[in-house]
């Protein structure tokens, strides 16, 4: 049966500036009501550091030409760049009967299950949200909840330049090493991994009527 809680709009945004995406998802969340269909956006960002609400200035270890944006998501500082799959989840949590912790678990489990399909063993850490392979972080998470609805989401390192992570304490953890799919032997591109990750997510979110839009 086609009801609001079974419908999803999936938007492939291509490469888009972080500030543009942030403003768009903030506006979407402010303007949505009980009849608004949930959306998931998939995007790659040009190189940018984003600082979460809990972020501390000292976690930026070195200044460079890479811009820094103060965001309204949870968490600390992280880095986005081409070759990283960013997924924004614009979900009415009340309608889906989800709390924040449950949505975090959905994101973590989806990445873990996807990597397992390619013999990459990944885990979540209860005290440090994200996904890790052999102690190295492969995916970062950060959410914002407004009016009972989520925005922001996750970033999965696929095939990117990881060196700017050395300019920060990733997610506030000094010395935290980062990894990516390519380094773990998974050679699919961002475009190839995106629908596979959505498929894993939807095994838990259970949208039965999905409409896809390509905005590149």
UniProtKB/Swiss-Prot annotation:
<feature type="domain" description="BPL/LPL catalytic">
    <location>
        <begin position="34"/>
        <end position="209"/>
    </location>
</feature>
<dbReference type="GO" id="GO:0033819">
    <property type="term" value="F:lipoyl(octanoyl) transferase activity"/>
</dbReference>
<keyword id="KW-0963">Cytoplasm</keyword>
<dbReference type="GO" id="GO:0005737">
    <property type="term" value="C:cytoplasm"/>
</dbReference>
<dbReference type="InterPro" id="IPR004143">
    <property type="entry name" value="BPL_LPL_catalytic"/>
</dbReference>
<comment type="function">
    <text>Catalyzes the transfer of endogenously produced octanoic acid from octanoyl-acyl-carrier-protein onto the lipoyl domains of lipoate-dependent enzymes. Lipoyl-ACP can also act as a substrate although octanoyl-ACP is likely to be the physiological substrate.</text>
</comment>
<dbReference type="GO" id="GO:0036211">
    <property type="term" value="P:protein modification process"/>
</dbReference>
<feature type="binding site">
    <location>
        <begin position="140"/>
        <end position="142"/>
    </location>
    <ligand>
        <name>substrate</name>
    </ligand>
</feature>
<dbReference type="InterPro" id="IPR045864">
    <property type="entry name" value="aa-tRNA-synth_II/BPL/LPL"/>
</dbReference>
<keyword id="KW-0012">Acyltransferase</keyword>
<dbReference type="Pfam" id="PF21948">
    <property type="entry name" value="LplA-B_cat"/>
</dbReference>
<dbReference type="InterPro" id="IPR000544">
    <property type="entry name" value="Octanoyltransferase"/>
</dbReference>
<comment type="similarity">
    <text>Belongs to the LipB family.</text>
</comment>
<feature type="binding site">
    <location>
        <begin position="153"/>
        <end position="155"/>
    </location>
    <ligand>
        <name>substrate</name>
    </ligand>
</feature>
<feature type="site" description="Lowers pKa of active site Cys">
    <location>
        <position position="137"/>
    </location>
</feature>
<keyword id="KW-0808">Transferase</keyword>
<feature type="active site" description="Acyl-thioester intermediate">
    <location>
        <position position="171"/>
    </location>
</feature>
<comment type="pathway">
    <text>Protein modification; protein lipoylation via endogenous pathway; protein N(6)-(lipoyl)lysine from octanoyl-[acyl-carrier-protein]: step 1/2.</text>
</comment>
<dbReference type="InterPro" id="IPR020605">
    <property type="entry name" value="Octanoyltransferase_CS"/>
</dbReference>
<protein>
    <recommendedName>
        <fullName>Octanoyltransferase</fullName>
        <ecNumber>2.3.1.181</ecNumber>
    </recommendedName>
</protein>
<feature type="binding site">
    <location>
        <begin position="73"/>
        <end position="80"/>
    </location>
    <ligand>
        <name>substrate</name>
    </ligand>
</feature>
